[in-house]
Amino acid sequence: MHMAVLGKTGTGKSSLLRHLMAQDIAQDRGFLVLDIHGELTPFILGTVNARERAEHCHLSDRLIVVSPGDREMSVGLNPLEGADDFVRVAEFSQILRERWALDHFGARTDELLRNSLFALAANGLTLLELSLLLTHTEFRAECMKKVANAEVRQYFELRFDTLSDAMRATMREPILNKTSAFTADPAFRHIVGQTHSSFSLREAMDAGAWVVVNLEKGRLGENALTLGSLILTMLKNALFSRAKRTLFTVYCDEIQNFVAQGSGIETMLSEARKFGVAFVAANQFLDQYPAETRAAILSIGTHIFFQLSSADATTISQALDGGKPLAERLKNLPARHAIVKSSSDRWTEIVVPTVLEPKVDYTDLVSRTRYVQSRVRVHIERDIAARQKRYTEISSEALDGWD
């Protein structure tokens, strides 16, 4: 069910992904795409709109677009919503540690981040409240009232709160420095700063929705990868509660950017298959994958190889028992030609058809989709400001709580 795609830039990977997604749209199969460069989003929107026109129907309720670069409106995706079990919180903590390079600050910083995320999740809060939690004693005390996990409460009440101000500052500053760089950017602040997500990934999978995450890393920077990592982790956690097991595909270019080291990608792929979720992972070179991730990717059942570098061609030809002739072919494949190998079959060569972007104006489709899933950013910021003002005003004399 899973598919690994490998090939140099311009050799046909995008044509293959377009072809597969166009088939999914035509046959009502759901998918999520992490569009790291923003190159697939226009094709998807155009293809959905072309189908609407051909069939005289409306499909905006099937389409969900997460677009941090949209300056006017934004969906909400709170990764901490409902994440009040320790395993899920630990996964989010691991993602943030790696994305923000917090590992070298040591175990104390790691423990503080993990327990802080758990406390925020238990209170129905967001990453935006992390600074308040770690700097505002009264706010932290009020949060502890809703934390059922005794170890988390004891960590803050018996350990963190008993430290000197200087020691607490030393522990929290690396976390807050990295967090603020993410949450201060309006492109991402208005997505993760909403207490309630605009949609459920589990329901989107069950309904066969088309979820497009337009990350535009070249324009939005490294924060786009953090958002993509959080969304992929949210999807992983949503797998286990699926009511339906109909096929849902995750298209992910450069997947190594979105999974944490030691997160057990091979386990994720195995579990996803059980719940009807297929991954299509595309990349340019094998050495872009960390060793553990590379092993998991190479164990996927179906591989499609476009033109490869000399080193990768040698490695793959040896794995396929093709020897030097196959290695030479892999190095010299014409554009859109690929070698396909599934687990039980001998490798074969195919030609991927050219898939052109439909020449349609999908502005109305985007407007309808935004109306259903998104909120005006000015309104989101107003809600955030009001919420944080309310929390800041909490004092030790009058802790009114919030519900």
Give the label of every model feature segment.
Residues 6-11, 16-277, 281, 290-292, ...:
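P-loop NTPase motor domains
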